[in-house]
Every structure is written in structure tokens, then in C-alpha cells.
């Protein structure tokens, strides 16, 4: 806390103070709400909706609505909102971020603003980090909403379109950021309105908002379809890369060296910059590539595709580690989320990187995907009318939340004072000494009976530590991406006396670690083991009035089991508190202070005692990439003996300073990504907006005829320009081109015309006549075949398909443009401005292409007895970008719609790429 904060109080304290009168008003209403019957309490929902329709605002209703939700929670799930949870709810309703520490009840807090904002009927999205939490919270908190007469839906990966549509139509919809984002993209790919699943983006509450809006902001959501290219080249590139020798780490040149033109020293066959996540062949490596692939000069444009494959193979070997960045299961490469440690099932890296990893691991190489639609979380969530979020760790990123999302952060005070002790880091020179020390501390603390949670950054490290504990005879549980199925069970019991748990970053965000164990979880598990259906277990844990004998019997069984386990866990809770509570050991500092704080936050919930300690070595990724030399010099001054660990507050501060440098570096990258994506986002808004108007049934016949007029006018200007005498016109060329477009000969209609305006008018009249003839012919053919046909709907379908085909090509072209635009910086031009200008020129070209494709297809469409019926839109492959997304080298693939690199001004497919 800064000097002024100490003197004047923090901004958050001032905000909380301003909100306290509202909390007092809610508390004053508690007695009157308790006096209402269940029916009267439920009737409040209809009353509030009527009052909104009569001109009152959500702010007017807030005190009473929050009091109603608090009372409903007491009657359904047996929990009462604390005052700090009311504060959090008010902050969320205001469209801000509530920073609430672990164990302070974020899940129940969100019910207050969710109910209030759902009263308008426009829907509320509650966003979680995984399917398990979405389903759990929808069932658990859903009891409150349903009691008050509201509908609750849940979107998880397995649901089909009909189930998704039903869930989105509910008052409140739970789901993950990935599912919401992909559904948005899919909705903008459908051909019929009935295939859409989402409705308007009204109000979103994002749980673990830092994880979703910051950690995952650089990773674009991509829907892909399979490409047509062979996978052989990936395997060949991998065989080549395996023969290469890696050079020394790239040395950063001083500014004076850069100004003097000193070149980067090269060694080996390729260089890899771990910090910047880039790879490059050296001159020696290029020579080896030319010999291996039998080519003369690999830098030639014709070998750009080969260069691309080599680049991705180098990345796969130099930048991506098995059991850290990905795992191999059942012959497939599965991505590990670097922030949560969970497997990202069904997701693939884009741009051929996933295929390169498959070739590296010797599993079947799947075909490369083609991007059909893409968006970043930054731009998806900025589309909501109102956005709010919760997390235990947001203050460190407040600047970014304000700059990108216009969200401020309010720290909500804890319900009870924090009793956790955060101990100084212990620093070692190497990882072997560090992990030996970690195991020794686990053994010593375990003797006291204190539960221990050990955080690791990778599957590999968690398995290594597990093996070391086995050697010492310490019984323990392991929670990582390979063993995620028992996550809830392991985390729920991690606070029991004497338990030792090793976890990657997944560490059960959203599941509280209760000292002594979780009686509710234990009672539920007992009922499930006895054969009770999961839906009945949910009913058994509810409190709503019912006369259903089966539910009442289930509640009796749950109450008995809960009471038994509660007696045991309460006694064990006191036992664990007596020995010092949960002890957290971090085996490595993460790049982000927030991830470390999340691990720390597992201990000391609701005033319980606890302690945390991080072990660091100079060989850790963070220390090697950022600030290693500074800390190493400091260690030498404090203690020159490399075998003796150092524990000092000044070292901890230096490590946190290194983390701040990483956070600043990553923030700059995310800002850069956003600058580029904002260009694409504006184009996406235009295309998707117009597409949606067409989809919603807008009559586009007049627009189609305008497209016809524009298309034939361009042809007239091309073959018979008014600036030239008619003797120089190419009338035969115009006649042939109009025949190609309309499938009818306009020779008679334009014969003898020598005035440009009259010629253009005659061609337009002919095109309109040809269109009417085509429409009449289609309707007659449909009637003869007994097929339902509607020309207006046919126009919509043809236009939408033309939009989709050109938009997909445009995405590829824009990606290619972005990969090469960094060269503009060399020419002293702002690459973002150059990208924007070139991008909008390409956008104009695409729009013209859509018009021409639509017109041609409408004149040539035929109806047959085997015409396809309406189908559910297929679910294409969902992929992640090459995270973290960074500018790529120019040696990439050339999109067929990109400008040809030869400088002709034509598209690549119409020039050098004609025969490819």
C-alpha cells in the first residue's frame, strides 16, 4: 500500500464506505422478507417485473431484490448472504470487478446481481472456467432462482444445438467462456435463423475474471474446417529438425551495438528465444535444409510453404515441452492449459503447430485446419451491454482491466480477519537442491499432522515430486491434467488432518478446501455410492417446500449422513486449527503474481490459520527468462556458498520485481494483439451485422438487384468505357461476360448502341429481364418436381454462402498480411496503421467479391429432386491459436486471395499461384 493510501485510505475503502448505506437498507428489509410465505416471496418476481415495465429502474429495485434473494437462499440452500457478499453483489450490478478472497463465497454472491438483472427478460450469462463448475453452480444456485420463478440453463461441451438453444432462452445461463465464444461464432456461420442458439449479449458475470479476461486474452477462439493438404511434409520437416544442433541462447545486444549495426552472433543450426517464443534457422541450418530437401535457395518465395513447416517443427521441439505444454494420451496430443493445468479436450493449436507436435511425438498426424471463424475473448466480452467479474486476485491487473475493458476493481473486505502467514521465499542455485528441500519440509510438516498442499507448474514436476515422496514413504494424492477426473474429491478432502496433496495450477479453483474435510461432499458421495441418482441427490440437499415422499426420504438420508460426517469434520477441524492449519508450498514462482496468490489463497479461508512458502531455484523458467542475473548477483553478495539456501525479504522483492516485468511484457503483447484484432473486429462487426439482418428475414430482393446493377455496370465500364469512343469498345467481350454472368445472350439488346449511358441502361434492363426469367423457370421446375421453393429464401441462402466463402478467404488473407506487416517497421512505418489501411482495402475487395459471387450463383442456380434439406449446422473443429499469440515470421503460407508477392497488383491465385 502506498503512502497516500495509508494516509487517506485506499480507493476501494472509499467505494465500500459509499455502498454501506445500501447494505444497511437491505438488512432493514430482512425481517419483512422472513415474514412472507414461500408463495408471497415467489410472487415478488412478478411484482418486480411489473415495476420495471412501469418505469422503475434496476437500481430502484436493488435493496428489495437483494433482500428477496437472501431470504430465498436461506430457504433453499440453507445459507444467508453476509454483508460483504451484499457489497460484492452491488459492485457486480454496477458493472465492476469485485475482488473477494478465497472462501468468501463468490458463488453465492453472484446470485444477487444475476437475479436483479434477469428481471428485464434479456438474459444473464454467468461465466465459469470449466464445465464442472458451470454444471455444479447451475444446479446449486439454480435452487434459489427456481424457487423465485426463474429459469436456469447450463451450457457444457456435450450439449447439442437444441439443448443449447433451450439453455440460452433461460433467464440465467451458466457456461464456460469457451462454449459461449464458440456458440457466438457458430451462430454467425448458420444459413437459417432456426439454427441459431444464442440471443442478445446483455449482462455477463465472469467468475475468475482474471483467468478469462487476462490470462486467456491472447488466445483467439478459432473454428476450423479440415484443409486439403497432405500431412507428409510435417513428418519430413520433423525428421530434418531432429538432425539439427541448437545454438547458444540469443544474446541481447546493447543499444550502441544495435545502432552500430553489430549483427547477432550465430551458433549451431538454429536459434531459439524462449522469452519471445521465436525460432530461426542460422545460415548453417539453411544450408543443411537445402541439402536435405534438395533445393537451391530456401529463402526463395517458392519455398515459403517448406519454410513454414520447418518453423513449426522447430517450435515443436524448442519451445514446447511434453507433460508441461501438452500430454500424449491414446495416440493423441492434448493441450494443457498453462493457466489452469487442465487438459483442453477437443482443442488444437492452429497454423500447423499441432501437426508438428504430432510428428514430433510419432502419433498420427491429422490434416491441417482452415480457419472458418475467429474472435478473441477481449472482443467477445466487450460486446456485452454490461460486464462484471469476480476473483480473489485482480488488483495487480487493475490497469489492464481499466485500459481494455473499462472495468475498475473494488476490494471487498473479508468476513473475518486474515490469519494466514506468508513466509519469505527460499532460493537455491539449482532445482535438485530445491526439490530435496521441498521434500524435507513436507516430511517435517507432515509429522505435525498439518495438511499440506504442494503447487507445481507442470505435470512432469508433479510426477517427479510424487516419486520422491513415495521414496520417503509419504502417502499423498496427485492432481494434474492426467488425473483430473477426481479433482473435486481430492480438493474437497485436501484439508483433512495429515493429508498431503500435490497439484498443478488447476488446484481446484472454485472448490473450497475446508480444514478437517467437507461434510457436504462426503454425505453426497455416500448417497451416490448407495445408488441414489445424481438428480435426486440435488433434491436431497435442497430446502424448498415439497410433499414428494421420495424427496423427503432422500432428504432424511442426506441429513443423517451429513450429521455423522459433520461431527467428525468439526472435531477434525479443531484438531487441524490447533496444529496451525493448511500449509501451502509453492515449488516455483509463476510468471504471474496472481497465479501465486491464487495458490496462497487456498489457505486461511474464513479466518482459519495457515501458512505459505515458495521455493525458488535459479534454474526455474522465470529466473532464467527474467531477472536471473540480478538475483544471482544478490545471492552472491548475501552468501557466496552455492549449497546454502537463502531466505531474505529482499530476495522475495527481487523475484516479485521479475514477475512485474513479465506482467508488463505480457500486457504489452496483449495490447498489441488487441490493436491488430480491433481492425479485424470492426470488419467482423460489419459482416456479422449484415449477415444477421439477412438471417432474420429482411427482404433482400432490392439489395440483390442493386448488386446485379453494380456488377453489370462494372463490366460495361471495363469493356466499353465512356471515356473512349465507341469504335474502341469491346462489345463482343462485354456480350461474352454478360453471358457468363446471366447465362443468357444480350447481343440483340445491346446491338447498335454507341452511347455509354444508354448501353449501361440497356444491359441493366437485360439483366433484370434475365433474372425474372430465371426466377419463373426455377418456380416452374420446383412445381414439377414437387419441391417447396421460395425465391426470396433462395436469395438469402445464396448470399449467406457467398459471404461465408469470401469471409473465410479474407481471414486467411488478413492473417497472411499480419504475418508480413512487421517489415513495415523496418521502413519506419507504424505496422498497425499499415495493417489497418491494407486490411480495409482488402475488405473492400472482399465485399465486391461477395456481390459478384452472389449474382453469378443466383443466375446459375438449379433445383433438383435431390436438393438438400435443412440440416443442423455442423460443429467444426475448435482450435486455439499458437498461444501465446505473437507476430510470426514472413516465411508463411500465401493466401490465394492475398496480393501476389511478385508486385503485379493481382491476387496470388490470379497470378503466380494460378497453377498451385
Protein language model regions, located:
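A short, cysteine/histidine-rich metal-binding "knuckle" motif
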Residues: 892-898, 903-916
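Conserved P-loop NTPase motor core
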Residues: 1-617, 622-638, 689, 706, ...
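Generic detector of ordered secondary-structure context
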Residues: 61, 302, 349, 393, ...
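Active-site-adjacent structural elements in folded domains
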Residues: 110, 438, 885-887, 895
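Short, Lys/Glu-rich amphipathic helical modules
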Residues: 449-462, 696-697, 750-754, 901
